[in-house]
From Swiss-Prot:
This is U1-lycotoxin-Ls1a. May inhibit growth of bacteria. Expressed by the venom gland. One of its GO terms (cellular component) is extracellular region.
């Protein structure tokens, strides 16, 4: 449980670093 939330958080973090 919570894998979806963690995945979304990682996606947002990656987008932040790439931006």
């Amino acid at each position: 449980a919570g894998i979806g939330k963690i995945g979304d958080f990682i996606k947002k973090a990656i987008a932040k670093y790439k931006n």
